[in-house]
Amino acid sequence: MKKIFVSVASYQDPLLLETLCSAYENAEYKENLIFGVCEQSSSGIDLNSIRFQDQIRYELLDPVMAKGPCYARSRIQSFIKDEDYYLQIDSHMIFAKGWDSLLLTYLDWIYEQTNINSIITGYPRSFK
């Protein structure tokens, strides 16, 4: 299976770690995920506490120096290496089981119908 680069820009978001763990735990092919994280926070997440830390490319920026989500996302793009797919998410999300396989299956189906590469976009539901 191909690699998915998951881009996460975060500004002082207490749900960042929960989001990363949800994406990882609910993926069918965990080994194919690479996370690019730009955290704009006064205290970053403890990467040593994350068992998949070797799959995270991480930068911590002082929130005083923050220049918004577009700036953080541009920093994250420098973390991309040879991954096949790019998924940009918010830092406060919960993932469904098998989300990675579902997205790739959907992309393959779109390509079969249209013979062009596509972009899937959406706005996630809120949660409590």
Which ranges hold each PLM region?
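Catalytic cores of eukaryotic secretory-pathway lumenal/extracellular enzymes that build
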Residues: M1-K128
